[in-house]
């Protein structure tokens, strides 16, 4: 997780509503947020709140402008369009998931 200041796991009550291109609203749970010194941005990773724990979930990632509490809100989410930036986000996610798996085994 080089080049990242911190990773903050999402709290149970941290949810964001996203609206798709058809105008449908879907509630997402915040998995975690982190900052990148290389890109000078904050990032949030989300998964659908409707998914059960035993299902494989599709995780969505966005850059965001933190509010006064340092949190993300749906109005301040921006798509990640750069391949190198995506690679960095995937590396952070994979490290987070590997750490989470090792904590479950302890």
UniProtKB/Swiss-Prot annotation:
UniProt similarity note: Belongs to the UPF0473 family.
Transmembrane segments: none
Source domain of life: Bacteria
Stored InterPro entries: UPF0473
The protein's name: UPF0473 protein LCABL_08490
Signal peptide: none
Organism: Lacticaseibacillus casei (strain BL23) (Lactobacillus casei)
């Amino acid at each position: 997780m080089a080049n990242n200041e911190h990773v903050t796991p999402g709290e149970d009550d941290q949810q964001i509503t996203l609206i798709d291109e058809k105008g449908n609203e879907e509630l997402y749970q915040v998995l975690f947020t982190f900052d990148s010194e290389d890109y000078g941005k904050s990032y949030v990773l989300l998964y659908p709140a409707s998914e059960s724990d035993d299902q494989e979930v599709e995780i969505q990632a966005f850059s965001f402008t933190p509010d006064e509490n340092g949190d993300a809100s749906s109005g301040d989410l921006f798509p990640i369009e750069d391949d190198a930036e995506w690679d960095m986000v995937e590396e952070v996610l994979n490290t987070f998931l590997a750490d989470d798996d090792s904590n479950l085994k302890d």
